[in-house]
Structure formats: structure tokens, C-alpha cells
A protein has these predicted regions:
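Auxiliary Fe-S-binding modules of radical SAM enzymes
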Residues: 100-101, 111-194
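Radical SAM/AdoMet-radical enzyme domain recognition
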Residues: 2-109
Length: 194
């Protein structure tokens, strides 16, 4: 069980931070327990707020469960970040508005050229940033160490848009140095360490 696994990991000497990346579907059932066993934050995948588009992407009709998971994590006091894959057909504005309403950082991740992504024609985060700037105001790269430390260490480059109160991060898996700052051990859903 995930909670027992995290409890065990927390006891390992040298483990400083445990952050979980999840689709959020079961998070509504475990948010409080995850906080209690020492999870330091959760990154939740949310590629759309449109139920039909969500179904096309995931093959599941579980958008409401994901949204409930986000609420449960926040209620439990877990720091939450939202992740969305930067697909060419993505309309980022509903996600930005949701992040703003929920006061959560939002990160856009370029599509990786593996599996389905090999056949996919994406757009760069630079293009997406320009699209967002047209709606959300001027974008300034965040450089203040104190502000950035709240975002945690990781591959995202954060921007503050003049008309938004939440930061928007961009993880450039293709057009940037995606893994040059990685300092993580990852446990896959299948139980493998990467």
C-alpha cells in the first residue's frame, strides 16, 4: 500500500523530501493519510477541465475524482502543483483560470517524443508562453530565490504573468535542459526505481 511505502521511505536516512506525482484519482481517499506519513507535496496531472476531452486523453471518466483529489490534498495541508501536458490542441486558459481560483501553481510540460508522443506534433513552451501573455499580461521570469524556493527544486522555469496571482511553470522536455537539475529517485507505478 502506498501509505505504508511512504512511511518506510520516510524512515530512510538521507531522504529529505517526498513529493508525489499522481493522476489524482484516488487522492480524495488518501490526502490526509499522505500528509500524516510525511508526504511533502503532490504534483497532480490535470490536462483539461473538459470531461469529454479528459475521457479522450485518459480513457476514463474520472475528472470529478481528480478535482476531488485536488481539494482533499489542499484540505489536508499538502502543497499542490498542477501539471498539464502542452498539447497543440490545448486551450490553456481554462486551466490557468482554475489554477488562479484554487491559488495553485500550474506547470506546462512539453510532450515527450516517446510512445504516443513520437507521432505527436507539439508546440514549444515558448509558443505557449506567448499565447498566455496575450491573455494574462506580461510574463516575467521569476528569479527571486525566496519565491522560487516555495516552488521546490525541479526542472520548471517559473514565470509571473502580470494579470495572474499564481506562478506558471514551464518544463521544457524538448526545447530546454530538462534533466540538468534533476536530483530525484523516481518510483514508477509498476514499482521500479528510475
Amino acid at each position: 500500500d502506498c501509505v505504508d511505502l511512504i512511511r518506510g521511505i520516510r524512515e530512510i536516512s538521507g531522504v529529505e523530501t517526498i513529493t508525489m506525482t499522481t493522476n489524482g484519482v484516488l487522492l480524495g481517499n488518501y490526502g490526509k493519510q499522505l500528509k500524516e506519513v510525511g508526504v511533502d507535496g503532490v504534483n497532480i496531472s490535470l490536462d483539461t477541465l473538459n470531461p469529454e476531452e479528459f475521457y479522450k486523453i485518459t480513457g476514463k471518466r474520472e475528472l470529478q475524482e481528480v478535482l476531488a483529489g485536488i481539494r482533499a490534498a489542499k484540505t489536508a495541508g499538502l502543497p499542490v502543483k498542477l501539471n498539464a501536458v502542452n498539447r497543440k490542441e490545448l486551450d490553456p486558459i481554462p486551466l490557468v483560470r482554475y489554477a488562479q481560483e484554487e491559488n495553485l501553481p500550474l506547470r506546462f510540460i512539453e510532450m515527450m517524443p516517446v510512445g504516443y508522443g513520437k507521432k505527436y506534433v507539439g508546440r514549444s513552451n515558448e509558443e505557449l508562453r506567448e499565447t498566455l501573455a496575450a491573455v494574462c499580461g506580461k510574463a516575467e521570469c521569476m528569479t527571486n530565490r525566496e519565491e522560487l524556493s516555495r516552488m521546490g527544486s525541479g526542472p520548471a522555469v517559473y514565470y509571473q504573468f502580470s494579470d495572474l496571482k499564481v506562478p506558471v511553470g514551464f518544463i521544457s522536455a524538448i526545447h530546454g535542459k530538462f534533466c540538468d537539475t534533476c536530483n530525484r529517485v523516481r518510483l514508477t507505478a509498476e514499482g521500479y526505481l528510475k
